[in-house]
Amino acid sequence: MDTLLRTPNNLEFLHGFGVKVSAFSSVKSQKFGAKKFCEGLGSRSVCVKASSSALLELVPETKKENLDFELPMYDPSKGVVVDLAVVGGGPAGLAVAQQVSEAGLSVCSIDPNPKLIWPNNYGVWVDEFEAMDLLDCLDATWSGATVYIDDNTTKDLNRPYGRVNRKQLKSKMMQKCILNGVKFHQAKVIKVIHEESKSMLICNDGITIQATVVLDATGFSRSLVQYDKPYNPGYQVAYGILAEVEEHPFDVNKMVFMDWRDSHLKNNVELKERNSRIPTFLYAMPFSSNRIFLEETSLVARPGLGMDDIQERMVARLSHLGIKVKSIEEDEHCVIPMGGPLPVLPQRVVGIGGTAGMVHPSTGYMVARTLAAAPVVANAIIQYLSSERSHSGDELSAAVWKDLWPIERRRQREFFCFGMDILLKLDLPATRRFFDAFFDLEPRYWHGFLSSRLFLPELIVFGLSLFSHASNTSRLEIMTKGTLPLVHMINNLLQDKE
C-alpha cells in the first residue's frame, strides 16, 4: 500500500516458500526480459491463454539507477567525531540528516549505495505530503480513490492520492544535505561499539567512524537497534507490476485503493477457498488508459502468504478483468513486517522508520508517518547536542527515544496492533463487512486512522463508531474474534507507564 519495502531477512515466515525479495527495477520499458524470480508457479491463465510464467517472462532485467551528481565523501584520515552518524540512506535517514545539519551540526550518512535511487514504490494521501511541503515530489495524483467491497458494493473515497516521485524526493533531500555540509560514506555498518560520550561504527570496508549519536535508519534489518522480546509480527506481502496494457477497466481519475472482489476465482475452487481463508485485494494506480501499476496484496497474515500464491491470484484477476499485459517496466516483491514488539526503550542507538517499529500495524503505512517524525527526532538531537549541560551518550539517546515514542504514541500503536490482531482472524466475507463499515465512518475517523492522527481517546470513539456502523454479523465477529486481543491490549496499556 503506502510503502513497498524490501527486507533483507530470508522469508522463512512465508507458507513454505522461499524467495529472494526484489524491489522495483527502475528501467525503461522493455518488451521481454530473462529475469526469473520464482519457481513452481501455477499455470492459471492470463492474457487469454498465457500462463503466469508467461507473464513473468515480460519482467525486465533489473537495472539500478543512480543520481547523477557528486557527493562530498567522509574523510576518515581526519579522525573527527561527528555529531550524528545516520546509518541508512532512505527517506527517514536523509530527512533527519538534512534537518540536523541545517542546525550547523556535523552529520555523516552511511549507506552501501548512497546515490542509488530508492527502488521502493510509495503511495501517499496528498494531504500528508502537502502538510510537509512535498507536493513537488509527487509524479502523479488522483482526485480520489475507490474501494470495491464486492461485486455489488463500491465506496468512493473523496481524498486525493498520489504516487511519490522517488528520484525527485531523494534528489531534493540529498541536495539540501550537501548544501548543509553532510558527508557521505559508502559502506555497510557491521558493528557499533559504545563509549560514554561517543560511539564507534565499524564498517565493512575497514573504516571506523566516530559519532556522538548513532541513528539506525536501515529499515527492517534490526541490525543495530536491539529487541528483547519475541519478534512475531504479521506480514503484508504483495507483488506489483508497472505495465503497459492494451486497456484496463478503471477510471484514470481515481486510484483503486482496495478491490476485494473474487469473481475472478469462480472457476478455480481450490484458489477461491484459499482466498476466502486469507484474502488478497488489488491495489491499482492508473496513469493512463494503457499504463497502470497493478498490485495484488495480502493486507496482513501470520505467517505471510507465499509470493507464488500472490502471483497466481493476480494472474487470475487480470485475466478476468480483461487486462492484457503488453510489457512490464518494473516489478516489485513486497514484504512488510507489521506489529510485533517495540525495540528496547531506551537504548544507545536511536532508531527511526521500520527498525523503530513505526510501520502502521493495521495498514502497512509508514513513509508519511516517518517523514513527519523526522523533525521530532532531529529537534531532540539538536536540543541535547546544543545544550550547555554535558550529556552522556545514554542520557542523550534516552531523551531522543522518549520524544520519538512518548506514551501517547505507544498507546496509539497498541490500539493499531489490536486492530491488526482482529484483521488477522477475518476471512474474506468478514473482511468485506469490516471495510464496508470502516469506510462508512465520518472521513475524520478513517482519515485519522490511516494517517496515524488519532490518539487513544479519539481511537476509542473511532472504535465505538465503527462498531455502531457495522452489521450485526460484523459486530458478532468483532466481539468473538476481538475479545482476546482486547484483553491483551488493555493489559499492555496498564503495564506501559511513563
Swiss-Prot record:
GO CC terms: chloroplast; chromoplast; mitochondrion
Transit peptide range per the UniProt entry: 1-79
Result when mutating residue 127 to A: Reduces catalytic activity 2-fold
One Gene Ontology term from the biological process aspect of the record: carotene biosynthetic process
Record note on cofactor: Binds 1 FAD per subunit non-covalently.
Catalytic function, reaction form: a carotenoid psi-end group = a carotenoid beta-end derivative; all-trans-lycopene = gamma-carotene; gamma-carotene = all-trans-beta-carotene; all-trans-neurosporene = beta-zeacarotene
GO MF annotation: an example: oxidoreductase activity
SUPFAM superfamilies on file: FAD/NAD(P)-binding domain
Localization, UniProt: Plastid, Chloroplast; Plastid, Chromoplast
Keyword Coiled coil: no
Keyword list, A-Z: Carotenoid biosynthesis, Chloroplast, Chromoplast, Flavoprotein, Isomerase, NAD, Plastid, Transit peptide
UniProt motif (FLEET motif) ranges: 293-297
Enzyme class: isomerase
Pathway: Carotenoid biosynthesis; beta-carotene biosynthesis; Carotenoid biosynthesis; beta-zeacarotene biosynthesis
InterPro entries per record: FAD/NAD-bd_sf, Lycopene_cyclase_b/e
Cofactor section: FAD; NADPH
UniProt xrefs under Pfam families: Lycopene_cycl
Effect upon mutating residue 296 to A/K/R: Almost abolishes catalytic activity
Effect of residue 332 to A: Reduces catalytic activity 20-fold
Enzyme Commission code(s) on record: 5.5.1.19
Residues that hold NAD(+) according to the record: 84-112
NCBIfam families reported for this sequence: carotene-cycl
Family as reported in the entry's similarity comment: Belongs to the lycopene cyclase family.
The protein's role, per its UniProt record: Catalyzes the double cyclization reaction which converts lycopene to beta-carotene. Catalyzes the double cyclization reaction which converts neurosporene to 7,8-dihydro-beta-carotene.
Subunit structure and binding partners: Monomer.
Official protein name in the record: Lycopene beta cyclase, chloroplastic/chromoplastic
Organism: Capsicum annuum (Capsicum pepper)
Lineage: Eukaryota, Viridiplantae, Streptophyta, Embryophyta, Tracheophyta
